[in-house]
Amino acid sequence: MNYSELLKKLTNLDKDYLVRVIGKTKFNRKIIAVERIVDESFSTAIFLSSIHARENITTDLLLEMVENKLFDKIDKFNLSFIVMANPDGVELQSGGLDRFPKRWQKKLVSMNGGSKDFSMWKANAKGVDLNNNFDARWGTNKHSLVPSSQGFVGTKVFSEKESKAISKYTKKMNPFITISYHTKGEEIYFNFFQDEKRLVRDELIAKRFASSTGYIIRNVEKSSSGGYKDWCVQKLKIPALTLELGSDELSHPISNENLSSIFEKNKSIAFDLEYAYNVFEKSR
């Protein structure tokens, strides 16, 4: 789903869902959170999708979940869906150079190694990999040294409008868990240098998600840094999961013909969240 399609979809949301603009990109596209607020005093489960441009089927999944009313019976906590964390990147990946000013197009081609094919692009329109730009051991692992299609951590922590807006909003919403959807591999990541007590708590939750989805838990702690999940674990000290959607046999970008099978494996999400909420509350 591209940015224009997203805006159109959001006009037809159920009345229980609110659309909030939490920030804007370099090229003035809206960073949008869709909220289901049960009670302002409650904590929140936050979902993040399309932080990597070529992984925009994750936006389709979130909206499919909302449209299928998977969350309608939740009454203990609020829900927030950051439905497209990287709208500039998604527009570039899906629509190409024409979606950007002429003055910027030459820079984009240069960042893309001279190619005008942006189908594999992950970064934002400044060539920063947003999922390497958060304040969690930032810049400590192998990464690109210059703006590019993927892997460039930025010039400093939170150098990008997107990561700044998302971090500010996340703290404001008092989350008890965050779920980041990526592609691909049908894997779950949850650990990032937690203390033993939090590690036990977070592993319980990860195992529940693994059981319901059939995904495999992987330990990528030593190879991860600067990610949204990493930041939530390290700085907010809450459970945070990354779910890699879609079989590893699929090719990037994953086409929408695979959406129904991805949805089927993730349709127990409301029950998983309720379990996570109970585990979190008991650990406090």
How does the language model describe each region?
Residues I46-L48, A53-R54:
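Short alpha-beta junction capping motif
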Residues L61-D72:
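…and closely analogous acidic/polar surface helices at protein-protein or active-site interfaces
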Residues I32-F42, S50:
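Short beta-strand-to-loop junctions in surface cap/lid or active-site-entrance loops
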Residues T140-R284:
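Metallocarboxypeptidase
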Residues M1-V34:
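Short glycine- and acidic-rich boundary segments immediately preceding or forming the N-terminal edge
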Residues N28, L130, L243:
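A residue-level signal for conserved active-site and pocket-lining positions in enzyme catalytic cores
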Residues T44-I46, L241:
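Conserved beta-strand elements of the Class I
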Residues F42, N56-I57, F71-Q194, R198, ...:
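Active-site/substrate-binding loop(s) of hydrolase catalytic cores
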